[in-house]
C-alpha cells in the first residue's frame, strides 16, 4: 500500500553555485558515501543535485514533517549501480510513524535539471 509519493526538481547550476558559495553545505546535506563515488572521486554537481532532490522527495512522501536530518536519508548505489535509499534516525522515525517501510526511488538529470521521485510503501 502506498503511504506517500514525493517529487522534486533542482536547477543544477543554481545548486552548484550554492555549493561553491557555502563550502560546508555539501557536508551538511550529504554523507561521505553520497559525496564520493566508490572509487573515491567527488560526485558531479548533477549527481549531488539529484540526491538532494531525492532527500526533498522523501520528506514530501512522508508528509513533510519537521525536524528531519539530511544525513538520516542516504542515497548510494546498490551493487548493480542503481540508486538505493536508506533511512535512519529522524527519517526512519517519521517513516515508522506513517507506516512506511519500503521505498522506490528514481533519479534523473538532463538539460540542467535534476529530479527525483520517491514512493513510500508499507
From Swiss-Prot:
Keywords linked to the UniProt accession: Cytoplasm, Fatty acid biosynthesis, Fatty acid metabolism, Lipid biosynthesis, Lipid metabolism, Magnesium, Metal-binding, Transferase
InterPro entries referenced in this protein's UniProt entry, alphabetically: 4-PPantetheinyl_Trfase_dom (IPR008278), 4-PPantetheinyl_Trfase_dom_sf (IPR037143), ACPS (IPR002582), Ppantetheine-prot_Trfase_dom (IPR004568)
GO biological process: fatty acid biosynthetic process
EC number: 2.7.8.7
Keyword Iron-sulfur: no
Required co-factors: Mg(2+)
UniProt binding sites for Mg(2+): 8, 56
Catalytic activity: apo-[ACP] + CoA = holo-[ACP] + adenosine 3',5'-bisphosphate + H(+)
Localization per Swiss-Prot or TrEMBL: Cytoplasm
GO CC, one annotated term: cytoplasm
Pfam families assigned: ACPS (PF01648)
Single GO MF annotation: holo-[acyl-carrier-protein] synthase activity
The protein's role, per its UniProt record: Transfers the 4'-phosphopantetheine moiety from coenzyme A to a Ser of acyl-carrier-protein.
Family designation: Belongs to the P-Pant transferase superfamily. AcpS family.
Descriptive protein name: Holo-[acyl-carrier-protein] synthase
Gene that produces this protein: acpS
Amino acid at each position: 500500500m502506498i503511504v506517500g509519493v514525493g517529487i522534486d526538481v533542482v536547477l543544477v547550476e543554481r545548486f552548484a553555485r550554492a555549493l561553491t558559495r557555502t563550502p560546508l553545505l555539501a557536508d551538511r546535506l550529504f554523507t561521505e558515501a553520497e559525496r564520493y563515488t566508490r572509487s573515491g572521486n567527488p560526485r558531479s554537481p548533477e549527481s549531488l543535485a539529484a540526491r538532494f532532490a531525492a532527500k526533498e522527495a522523501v520528506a514530501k512522501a512522508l508528509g513533510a514533517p519537521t525536524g528531519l536530518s539530511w544525513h538520516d536519508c542516504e542515497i548510494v548505489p546498490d551493487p548493480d549501480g542503481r540508486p538505493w535509499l536508506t533511512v535512519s534516525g529522524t527519517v526512519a522515525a517519521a517513516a515508522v510513524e506513517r507506516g512506511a517501510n519500503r521505498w522506490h526511488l528514481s533519479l534523473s538529470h538532463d538539460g540542467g535539471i535534476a529530479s527525483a521521485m520517491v514512493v513510500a510503501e508499507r
